[in-house]
Every structure is written in structure tokens, then in C-alpha cells.
Amino acid sequence: MSFVFNEAEFKKESEEFYSTYPADVSEIENELNQRYEKEKVSAMVQKKWTYEAIAQKCKVKVFRYCPFYSEVITGRDRNSVAGAFPPIPGLGCWALRTHYPVKEFDDWRKPYVERDLLFAEMMTDHSHHYADVERVLYDGFEKIRKEVSEMKAESTEEQEFKDSMLAACDALIALGYKFSEEADRMLQTEKDDSVREQLIRIRDTAGRVPRLPAKTFYEALTSVWFTRELCTAMEGSGFAVMGHYDRILYPYYRKDIEEQRITKEEAQNLIDCMMLITEARWKHNENTSGTNASVVIGGCDREGNIIYNEVTEMILNSFEKYEVSSPKLQVRISSKHPDKYKKHVALIAKLGRNCLSILNDDVLIEAHHRAGKKIEDCRMYLAGGCQEPVLSNECNSRAFMYLNLPLLLDAMLFPKELDFWSKENLRISRVDTAQNFEQFYESVVYNTAQFLAMCAVHYYRFEQIWSEINPMPLYSATMKSCIEKKTEITKGGAVYNSTSFSLIGIGTFIDSLYAIKKTVFEDRKYTLEHLKEMIKADFQGFEADRQYLMNKLPKYGQPDAGVDKLAKQVFHDLAKHSSGMPNPRGGYYEASLFAFYFYDVVKENTWATPDGRHAGQRISRGCNPSETSENIDAATLMNSLRSIDMAEYPGCGVTYLEMPVSQTDTDVTLFEYVLSAFVHCGGSALDFNVVDKDKLIKAKENPDQYRNLVVRVCGYSAPFISLSEELQDEVIQRALRNG
């Protein structure tokens, strides 16, 4: 059975269908509400009811021009490919909505969020999860159900968990049959032979896969996609990680080729269609922050064998062919990968396919191993969303709380005006009594550690609420350890259970500390009180001093031994004090440095900083230097990573690289050099944003002519014309500054 991907018809069909979303499921939801009002059961039982209602009462959609099936009409938003918080419409979030908002959490976070010290919308991460699709691929839900049925429940809680997992397995099996029946119904009237061929394939497959293990390349793709999509639709959470596709799919492809069941051309068509599903669903002008959906390629297997095969090449071919912002391509790379792989990845970057993240295996595997995880498990890491790493047997909570480091430093300089301390009865170490920079820095580190520890104490309780308002038994069923431990995923059922606070503005933070070190304690150019006076005035009346601070002092990212030494110390101390605190799932905090777009969001209330930055200006992104730093090109940016041990950051530290060059004139060798330098210099994660500054300016003036121009904003990708005018200007300014 062959398949030729008709991109135009698929996109047209998808747009016609998804433009009607969200579907009205109020009748089903009202029935659930009435039942809940009468019985007031636990959230776990609510999820069981949800699965049963979806399986029994929701319709399914089979697309004529797509061979994959997964669309269950649960009432969720069109733009809900990998996120579900705040609770979105649809039955998957019904249980969560009945318990939302959580006053305890909202009351605590409000003063910090209002002043932009924290960006904290969620009690825990609702977007960056990985259901173990590989287990479903090999075992199927029928076998998983059997394992659940053999679980010996010894309490009411365990029995409810068991019953809900059984209901989840039953629901997915029943929905598979529904897709088979719908395809058969459509066959009664379908006249197009090529469409009929795909409907027959769906009819004959959906009742078996993923109920049973996949046997072919097509079935493997279908099983992986179906599982991930149904988890997103039914769990009220986001499953950003689609899977490590080239590693898990290659054995099926090789077997099909050997048995002449498939041609390479048809396999490429199937991959092309799969890579365009999330893009076809998403409507960018409604939400520019991207889908989060991510495909992982490269890397290695459990034994450390390098992954690079024909499926890797086919996935790269798709990204070479199509200008999409989704899914994101998470490229695992190391010093051991072949040059052919690096060259193809470099070509994707050169073409401006700005949905690309590079993950350095040499650093990230070591980072997770240092965190106490088995080396064979560390080798199996994935990533999703922006770049958030997660092991295949791990439930992490990342990218849910962001700490504004520059504003925290200002709060130490102005503890009365920016009082983030008394609310928590924190006794801070006064920085204004320091006799030298060493004492000043010790106070800064102590206060930062106190604040992080305080946040971890509060979030210990907030993470406990997770299981009370939105347990995830379907997700749990895909994790073998949850069944073995008889523990639901949000309570610690995974093998590894990590949490991370995201620290933003580290470049601005380092530059500010260095400015204090140099001008106050070494050169005695200013007293600390005078510097504070300038900061409080936003440098009004002190422009000459601001220019000195901005342009005469070396900055992080520029080649300077003094700044490099301080940067190394700051990175180390922040990693140390944002790691190791316990979470309620039996795991610990891990250090991370990524920004999403919150480096921009928090600027409004971030005071001026000692490096000469004006109040209201953006702070630095990820591991990057300050946005105002000059003369920092790709080479100096890579070199700045040499002195920093990024393996102290299991949650990864992201370097964002603007390459303002014409996509037609630049040799791909430049991008190969950047990739090699990034790995050699010990970077953790790298985001490319390859843009033509002239094209950006033209796109802003004539948006209809540049609908396919995709840019990397910061962790997420989006069509340039979908961005707000302010963000468009910011992307243009980055290109101009680095050009």
C-alpha cells in the first residue's frame, strides 16, 4: 500500500476542520458536572469519568489526506497541541477546571508577579512532558492493561489509581475501534482511489494499533503519534516531546525495506506528513508562543552507540523542504557524530529553518549523570518545548517559574523600596556594609540562595496540590515504574522526578556585579551610595556615567579575563544554590538557564541596573550576554562558554545565536564551524535565529509577501508576521546589532 503526500489538500482539509474549533461539548461536560455535584469524588475518579465519557460520547475525525489518526473531538482549542494551562476548553481539562484557581498559590505569587521579580503562572509544569510512547510501541495498550489489572491495590487510593489506569487503557483501545469504524463509514461514499487506499489502511490498522505492538514503519509512526496526541487531549496537560524518532523508528523502517513492504520514497512521504501535522493545526495569529511540540533526532542509544541513520536523514529532509515553525527539531549532537550529520544540520540552520535547537550530548549526558542518574538512562534523554531536557523514565517540572536575577540584585541594593524580603521573614545579608567585593558578593550569593530556598519550600506544597487537582493516570500507565510502584506520576511514580526554577537575566546580572566590583571596590570611581542614586534616578542627570558603565567597562561575552573569572563563579554559585532542594515527588531541584520570552515580559518593572541599563529595557536571555553588549559575534559568544561548566545545569543552559546573514550568500561551512565550536567549547543548548535583516524590515512593511518567514524568538519559533510590533522590532534590532 503506497502513500503520496498531497500537502496542499492536507492543509486545506485541516484548515477547514480546525477553523471550527473549539467544538461544543457542553452537554457532556454538564453531565459530568451534575455527577460530580452529587458524588464529590476525588480528582482521580474524575479522570476515570473523563476517559469513559470521551471514549463513549466523543466523535473522531479521520482526514482524507492524512494516513494518521488521532483527532478526538473533546472540545479542546485548536491551539492546544502541547499545552493546557490555564485550563483550556475541552473535556481533558474538566477535572482541573473544577479545582481552579488555587487561592493559596495565587495569593503567594501575586506580589512577586506584579513587580516582575517572578514569572509564575503555574504551580508546576503543565507543558513539557513525555509519555513513554516507546513502551506503547513495543507492548501496546492491551499488554499495559494486563499489567495494570495484575497490580495489587492495598488502599482506596491505590484502587482508584488502578481503576483510572484501566479506564484510560480501555478508552484508547475503544477510540482505536472508533477510528476504524469511521474510516469504514467514509469508504461507503469515497470515490477517489488514492483516498480510498488510505481509508482502507486506517480501517485495517486502527483497531489493532496501538492496542497491540506496532509491526511496520507506518504502524510505528501511528502508534507514537496517537499516544502522544491522546495524552494531550485527555490529560489536561501538555506533552511537548513527540519522541526520539530516528532511534525508535529505524528498526521498523529497516525491516520494511528488507521485506519490500515500503520504499524509501513512501517512507519520506509519511515522515513529511507527520512533520506537518502540528503546523496544519496551529493558528499563529491567535498565539505566537509556538506549539511546544518537538521531535528529537541524533544522540545515542542506552549503550552509547551513535544514532544517525536513514530516518534521521528523512526527518532532516522534511525540515529542509518545508518552512515551518512546528514541530521544533531538537538535534542531539556530540563530538562523535559523523560530519555528514553535522553538515546536514548546518544546512537546515543556513536555510533559516528557525525551529532548530542543538543539544550537546557531551555536556547534557554528563549533567544528568552528575545529578545521580544511571548513565544508560542519561543517554536516553529527550527534550521538548523550548529545549527542556527530560529522561524517558522521568517526570520533570521545568519552565513554570522564572526568577528575574537583575531585579533580585536591585532588591538587595534597595531592600526597603523593593521589599521582597519581609513578606517571608527573610533576614538578608546587607550588601551596603561590605568592605570589599568579596564580602559584597558573598552577601549577594547568600541572599539569592535564601530566596531560592524560600521559593522551593512554597513550591513543595504547590507541587503536592498537583495530584489533588489533576492526576494523570493515562500518562502514568505509559510509565512502567508507576505500575510497579503503585504510584501515580504526579506523586513520584516515575524513576526520576526533577524540578527546576529558570533563572533569567544572568548576563545582565554578571555585568552589574562586575560594574560594582570595578567602579566601587577596585577603582573607587563611585561610592555604592552614589551608584545607587544613579540607579534610582534611572541615570537621569547621569548620562555620562551611564555611558561609562555601558561602554567603557568590559562585559560578559567579551574577551576579558576579569569578567570571565567572575562569570565562571556566578554560573557555579547559581547552579549550586538552585539545585538539591527536595520536591514532594521524591526528587530534587536541578539548575537551568532558559528564558522563553519572559526576559521581555519582566522588563517593565525591572529597575535600572548597575551596568548602565535603563529601567524598562530588556534583560539578557538564557546564557547570553546583555542585549546591549557590543562586538559579540558567534566566535566570541562560543568562546565565552569555555570557562563555564555547563554540566552543572541538567535543566540546560541555552545560548541564543543571531546569524544576520543572507541565506543565499553564506557558505554552509560557517554553520558547521559554529556547531563544532559550540560542542568543543562546552555549550549546553543552542538556538539559531538565522535572519536577513533587510528581509525582516520588508516583512514588517509587507506582511502578506512573507507569510512563511519563520524566526526564533527565544525558545519558541513563530512566523515573523504573527508577532506583535514590539517583538518584531526586537528581532530586527537583534539582527541589526549583530550584523
Q: Where are the regions a protein language model picked out?
A:
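Conserved catalytic cores of very large enzyme subunits
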Residues: 1-162, 194-201, 205-739
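Extended non-globular scaffold/tether segments
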Residues: 163-174
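Extended, non-transmembrane alpha-helical coiled-coils
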Residues: 174, 178-181, 185
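A conserved hydrophobic secondary-structure block that centers on an alpha-helix together
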Residues: 187-194
